[in-house]
């Protein structure tokens, strides 16, 4: 049996496409507000997993847990993304926990760089010296200020390249659709580890949440939540490698050169240059983070591929998401729809 340890997870069938899909016209179906409601976990509720796999709960009882990072000694760090949020350290197979950091402004992304733990808050990126043995953190040092960028999409993914030369940060847009955001919103930014040398690495990314380098590669990947209010099947979320200098559509186009009617006639140059993402996901499924699998416990077809977490829709007539899906890779490229997923009945749980 293959064991999946689930700390935060969860429902619905998803189909990822690795070629440009046939998209419906905008407003082919009505814009629908259909949010799920958090309910208590039913007594008999359990995650549904592919044949041959089992699932066990690692830890529970968090306040809006949004991100996990494994430490060098096997500890697991978890961010609680509330107004005065925390970074927790879990040890002893999730049975023991302590607050590493507290009183943070909606902490989200985490990353290691040498002796430092980097933490993304809504308006700031800070680094803390981390004591590996004691599992404690020193005083925070702000390396990047994002003051004023806490409106709209405030979560920030963090990633370092393999050599540790650059820090990459995702910065979402200020709204679902707006023209006139600062040029460094809806982007992936690049800095030196000390916060100097700011550069815009890629643009047109409405809400890039997950941010990681592929194994044995200098290729950065991101998971992106796309815009709303075009109907059930527009605009698809996506999962893609990111080209330096690339433009990915927002707010003028989407999924390649499909012009957004709300920006009709504007920036045809950008519309025409919009990159089609590697993997197109269902619209409004709310993809969050992802992780590449490099272990040996699962069958060979899982190695090198990516697990994606889908939080679930809030504006589709038929709800979608609530699952953890897997996209297989071969030679560093995605090869097809997911081959397995962990899911549960909608609204019982929400993966992050």
Task: For the regions a language model picked out, list residue spans one by one.
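Beta-propeller domain segments
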Residues: 17-50, 155, 173-176, 186, ...
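Beta-rich catalytic cores
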Residues: 54, 64, 83, 96, ...
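A short beta-strand motif characteristic of beta-propeller blades
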Residues: 56-59, 96-101, 141-147, 196-201, ...
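Residue-level detector of Asp-centered blade-edge/turn motifs that repeat once per structural unit
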Residues: 70-73, 112-114, 160-164, 214-217, ...
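Short loop/turn segments immediately following the C-termini of beta-strands
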Residues: 73, 81-82, 122-124, 130, ...
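Residue position within the beta-strands of beta-propeller blades
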Residues: 77-79, 119, 168-170, 221-224, ...
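Asp-box/WD-like beta-propeller blade repeats and closely related beta-sheet repeat scaffolds
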Residues: 97, 101, 106, 111-113, ...
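Positively charged, low-complexity/disordered segments
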Residues: 346-352
């Amino acid at each position: 049996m293959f064991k999946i340890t689930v700390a935060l997870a969860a429902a619905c069938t998803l189909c990822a496409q690795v070629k440009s899909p046939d998209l419906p016209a905008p407003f082919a179906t009505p814009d629908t507000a259909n949010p799920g409601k958090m309910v208590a976990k039913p007594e008999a509720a359990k995650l549904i997993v592919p044949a041959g796999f089992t699932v066990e709960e690692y830890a529970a009882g968090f306040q809006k847990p949004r991100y996990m990072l494994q430490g060098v000694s096997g500890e697991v760090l978890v961010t609680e993304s509330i107004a005065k949020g925390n970074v927790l350290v879990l040890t002893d197979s999730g049975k023991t926990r302590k607050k590493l950091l507290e009183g943070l402004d909606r902490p989200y992304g985490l990353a290691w760089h040498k002796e430092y733990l980097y933490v993304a808050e809504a308006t700031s990126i800070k680094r803390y010296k981390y004591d590996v043995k004691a599992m404690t953190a020193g005083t925070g040092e702000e390396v990047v200020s994002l003051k004023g960028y806490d409106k709209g999409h405030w979560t920030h993914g963090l990633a370092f390249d393999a050599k540790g030369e650059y820090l990459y940060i995702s910065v979402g847009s200020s709204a679902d659709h707006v023209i006139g955001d600062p040029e460094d919103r809806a982007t992936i930014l690049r800095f030196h580890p000390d916060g100097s040398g700011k550069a815009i690495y890629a643009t047109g990314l409405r809400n890039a949440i997950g941010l990681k380098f592929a194994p044995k590669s200098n290729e950065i990947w991101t998971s992106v939540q796309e815009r709303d209010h075009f109907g059930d099947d527009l605009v698809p979320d996506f999962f893609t490698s990111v080209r330096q200098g690339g433009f990915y559509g927002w707010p003028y186009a989407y999924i390649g050169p499909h012009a957004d009617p709300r920006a009709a006639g504007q920036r045809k140059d950008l519309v025409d240059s919009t990159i089609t993402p590697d993997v197109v996901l269902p619209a409004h499924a709310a993809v969050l983070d992802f992780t590449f699998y490099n272990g040996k416990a699962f069958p060979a077809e899982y190695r090198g591929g990516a697990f994606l977490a889908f939080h679930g829709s809030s504006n589709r007539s038929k709800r979608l998401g609530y699952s953890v899906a897997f996209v297989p890779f071969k030679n560093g490229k995605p090869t097809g729809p997911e081959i397995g997923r962990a899911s549960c009945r909608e609204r019982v749980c929400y993966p992050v």
